[in-house]
């Protein structure tokens, strides 16, 4: 059995980890970094860039560079959060046929957020494979604890498109608790995991206990906001910079995708700098231009100003903490440790707000960027049997139920119920002689069904005619360990049953997933061919350089016909390198190698010939010296001439 890798698929950055020698190990990517930007770019020549390379070219290719798509995954285009994001990103967001939010490139190619996320997952998969030296097919992938069923299913679909069998979907705060608590001793304790990442926020209250020699991680309650994170903090800075520039220059930079991308990068940098300094300067020369010429942006930003801009966002993260504590039946003073996860928790204002609420300083010994991936790897180790004596008890974050008469939401499974779990409830018909019922499955906390998230609708038909209220229809909900729901409805009299795995009215159809899997496979093959072509070009380039050096050093020693053959082979190879035919490049590389060998052989022969001539000349000189007869001479003075 191969390794089950752990992947933190983040809004801003992603990370991959494996169990290695009983310890979780974060793997560096091909650039040598332990985290990878969750950014995917499509270039004009058809190349797909992922991670740092995609981020580097974002300013020059803003409409085809996709970031923060995790905020769109499993969401409808009409969602208020999606509409809010449209004005903040330079790329296109539009509605797919089923109403889902999809993204669009500058040449009108449409893609599901799952496809973009799959590219990031492929990069994580390749990173692990390069390290292990073997193929990886199984993974544990993390999601925000407050992700609903649609978002979880969409994440699983992204894994499938990337060629991964997703063995488990695990909540991010729970993963962080695993990373923190696995090797900690010291008795039972309750911890709060405050996870403020790039695009989402979660808080989980978790009890770590020793039960019969087994370390048990039980989630007592979870809460959060799937549209609150570092991106929102960045957007506040962007809005401030745009407004200040508009006041000064009378130009609205929101309408310029290139300027917007530069502002995005600058805002993120400024925010990070202000975590360690009191003031920074945002300087963007030539940010735009009008009839009077180029315009430059130069604005000072203080930590105090930044904190004022985001104060309501920080406060917004505290309310779910209060709710989670209440749901767990605890007070802040009952919490033994507070763990911070997610890059945005490096902001001093956030740390202070958390410390004030819980009444204790958060721990600083957990890496906020890596803890979630480490926890995912540990869960992978548990599933593979490599990690023993660990039990993880997670919960469903939102209540699940159906719509009943009068548009009421009737809960069947309450929020914060430990999963996996099953629950059933019996309902009846609303009209006389009703032969079918429609089961409308919902997720949420509102009393009115229409305000909750619709997951699916299906019909149970074949009910025997009877007065209203007489037939008995049993509706059963079954949540698996991934938090994904299966629903069935059964007429108790006839035993007729209808089952459905909730794929949500949104989400990808099996046909769409299969197409995307096929596209990903084709792209993997294309990527492989591209790498092989680059390798062939690099080899050819090295040979050309070496051959030219050889001509310079040895050209004067060999005949013109040898040099002519080498020059011809050089020219042919240089021509081949302008194209994309790998076979031709390799064939002409071989021809040049052979011509080069002839050059070296001729040069060596010429050198040996030169040495032979020198030896012959020395012999003649020696013989002539032997024929000389010694004689005595009398010196003749000039005055005797």
From Swiss-Prot:
InterPro entries tied to this protein: ATPase_NBD, Chaperone_DnaK, Heat_shock_70_CS, HSP70_C_sf, HSP70_peptide-bd_sf, Hsp_70_fam
Bias (Low complexity) ranges: 606-623
Induction: By stress conditions e.g. heat shock.
Entry annotated with the keyword Phosphoprotein: yes
Keyword hit for Transferase: no
Disordered: annotated span: 606-627
Domain of life where this protein originates: Bacteria
Record-stated family: Belongs to the heat shock protein 70 family.
Task performed by this protein: Acts as a chaperone.
Protein name: Chaperone protein DnaK
The organism of origin for this protein: Xanthomonas euvesicatoria pv. vesicatoria (strain 85-10)
UniProt gene name: dnaK
């Amino acid at each position: 059995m191969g390794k089950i890798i752990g992947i933190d698929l983040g809004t801003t950055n992603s990370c991959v980890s494996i169990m290695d020698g009983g310890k979780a190990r974060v793997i560096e990517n091909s650039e040598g970094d332990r985290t990878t930007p969750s950014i995917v770019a499509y270039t004009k020549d058809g190349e797909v860039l992922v991670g740092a390379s995609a981020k580097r070219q974002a300013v020059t290719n803003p409409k085809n560079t996709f970031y923060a798509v995790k905020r769109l995954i499993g969401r409808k285009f009409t969602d208020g959060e999606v509409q809010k994001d449209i004005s903040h990103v330079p790329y296109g967001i539009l509605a797919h046929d089923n109403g889902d939010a999809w993204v669009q490139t500058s040449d009108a190619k449409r893609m599901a957020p799952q496809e973009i996320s799959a590219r990031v997952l492929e990069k994580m998969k390749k990173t692990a494979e390069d390290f292990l030296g073997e193929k990886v097919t199984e993974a544990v992938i993390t999601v925000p604890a407050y992700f609903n069923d649609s978002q979880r299913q969409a994440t699983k679909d992204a894994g499938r498109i990337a060629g991964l069998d997703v063995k488990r979907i695990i909540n991010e705060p729970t993963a962080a608790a695993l990373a923190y608590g696995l090797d900690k001793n010291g008795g039972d304790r309750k911890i709060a995991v405050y996870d403020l990442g790039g695009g989402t926020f979660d808080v989980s209250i978790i009890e770590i206990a020793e039960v019969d020699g087994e370390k048990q991680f039980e989630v007592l309650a979870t809460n959060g906001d799937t549209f609150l994170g570092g991106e929102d903090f960045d957007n506040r800075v962007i809005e401030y910079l745009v407004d200040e520039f508009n006041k000064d220059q009378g130009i609205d930079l929101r309408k310029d995708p290139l300027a917007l991308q530069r502002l995005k990068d600058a805002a993120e940098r400024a925010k990070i700098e202000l975590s360690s300094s009191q003031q920074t300067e945002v300087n963007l020369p030539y940010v735009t231009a009008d009839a009077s010429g180029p315009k430059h942006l130069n604005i000072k930003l203080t930590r105090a100003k930044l904190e004022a801009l985001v104060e309501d966002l920080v406060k917004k993260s505290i309310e779910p903490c209060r709710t989670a504590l209440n749901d767990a039946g605890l007070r802040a003073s009952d919490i033994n440790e507070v763990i911070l996860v997610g890059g945005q928790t490096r902001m001093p204002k956030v740390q202070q707000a958390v410390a004030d609420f819980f009444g204790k300083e958060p721990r600083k010994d957990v890496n906020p960027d890596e803890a979630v991936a480490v926890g995912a790897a540990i869960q992978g180790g548990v599933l593979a049997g490599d990690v023993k004596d660990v039990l993880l008890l997670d919960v469903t974050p939102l209540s699940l139920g159906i719509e009943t008469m009068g548009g009421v939401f009737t809960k069947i499974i309450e929020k914060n119920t430990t999963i996996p779990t099953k629950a059933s409830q019996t309902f009846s018909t609303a009209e006389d002689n009703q032969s079918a019922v429609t089961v409308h499955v919902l997720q949420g906390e509102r009393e009115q069904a229409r305000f909750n998230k619709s997951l699916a609708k299906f019909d149970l038909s074949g009910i025997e005619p009877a007065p209203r209220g007489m037939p008995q229809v049993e509706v059963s909900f079954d949540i698996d360990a991934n938090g994904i729901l299966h629903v069935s409805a059964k007429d108790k009299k006839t035993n007729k049953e209808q089952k459905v795995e909730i794929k949500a009215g949104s989400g990808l159809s099996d046909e769409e997933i299969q197409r995307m899997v096929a596209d990903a496979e084709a792209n993997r093959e294309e990527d492989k061919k591209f790498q092989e072509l680059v390798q062939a070009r690099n080899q050819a380039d090295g040979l050309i350089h070496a051959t030219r050096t050889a001509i310079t050093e040895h050209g004067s020693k060999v005949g013109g016909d040898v040099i002519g053959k080498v020059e011809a082979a050089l020219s042919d190879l240089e021509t081949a390198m302008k194209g994309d035919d790998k076979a031709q490049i390799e064939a002409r590389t071989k021809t040049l190698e052979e011509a080069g060998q002839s050059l070296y052989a001729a040069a060596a022969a010429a050198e040996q010939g030169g040495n032979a001539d020198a030896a012959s000349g020395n012999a003649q000189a020696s013989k002539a010296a032997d024929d000389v007869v010694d004689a005595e001479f009398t010196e003749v003075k000039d005055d005797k001439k």
